[in-house]
């Protein structure tokens, strides 16, 4: 009986050790290599839609406390093998105060001066190239913006009576060549005029592609924004691929 009990205890001990090893491996991969990420809002439309699933790589910018999954690491200063993002990169970050995960686009690097005038973006005193594009029509799906969304007024029906979203698109090209589409809902939004603000050393200026519906570096922390330029240490990783999209597509970034 004693031998049987001993073997049973050995079996349980091995199982527990195996589980611990697996959990540590998963944590290590999530923290150092890549992890999945779910888009929870419309702030990065039209590039990313509410409900999209992403793969976020952890190594392009080095590692900091924000790289560790599940917010297990205490906030510290410094970054191992740190490399600054490029303008136009889409990054996942921890909010500097709440540690909630956000996803935004890098607009300004350390030393840049950022301003907006009537919705037009200026970097270092020069207007960013922008071009109005034809409206983007997106078929309705379960993640279609609801009445509480700033995009709800663009919900309409096409010729066949199908419910769609018709979005006003402006294509921007940042210094360095990164080109992407943004949503410009017209005048009258508080974030249409901002700055100028100089990005401090060790910080980044981040914005959502849904320019009039994004709580980003232009928006105070009290209004759930980022409250200005964000410390580089708060960046957790770079968005690489949509593993599943609500519109059925998969794209690289």
Region annotations inferred by a language model:
Residues 2-13, 32-33, 37-38, 43-253:
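Soluble "head" domains of membrane/secretory-pathway proteins
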């Amino acid at each position: 009986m004693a031998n049987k009990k001993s073997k049973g205890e050995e079996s349980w001990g091995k199982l527990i050790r195996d589980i611990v090893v697996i959990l540590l491996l998963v944590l290590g991969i999530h923290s150092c290599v890549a992890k999945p990420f779910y888009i929870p809002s419309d702030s990065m439309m039209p590039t990313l839609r509410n409900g999209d699933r992403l793969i976020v790589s952890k190594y392009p910018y080095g590692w900091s406390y924000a790289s560790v999954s599940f917010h297990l690491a205490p906030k510290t200063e410094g970054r191992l093998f740190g490399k600054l993002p490029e303008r136009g990169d889409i990054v996942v970050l921890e909010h500097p105060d709440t540690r909630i995960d956000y996803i935004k686009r890098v607009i300004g690097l350390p030393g840049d001066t950022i301003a907006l005038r009537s919705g037009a973006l200026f970097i270092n005193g020069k207007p960013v190239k922008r071009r109005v594009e034809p409206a983007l029509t997106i078929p309705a799906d379960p993640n279609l913006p609801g009445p509480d969304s700033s995009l709800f007024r663009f919900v309409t029906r096409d010729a066949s009576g199908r419910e769609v979203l018709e979005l006003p698109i402006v294509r921007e090209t940042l210094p360095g060549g990164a080109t992407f589409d943004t949503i410009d809902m017209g005048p009258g939004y508080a974030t249409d005029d901002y700055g100028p603000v100089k990005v401090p050393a060790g910080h980044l200026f981040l914005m959502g592609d849904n320019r009039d519906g994004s709580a980003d570096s232009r928006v105070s922390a009290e209004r759930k924004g980022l409250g200005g330029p964000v410390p580089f240490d708060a960046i957790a990783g770079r968005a690489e691929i949509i593993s599943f999209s609500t519109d059925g597509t998969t794209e690289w970034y």
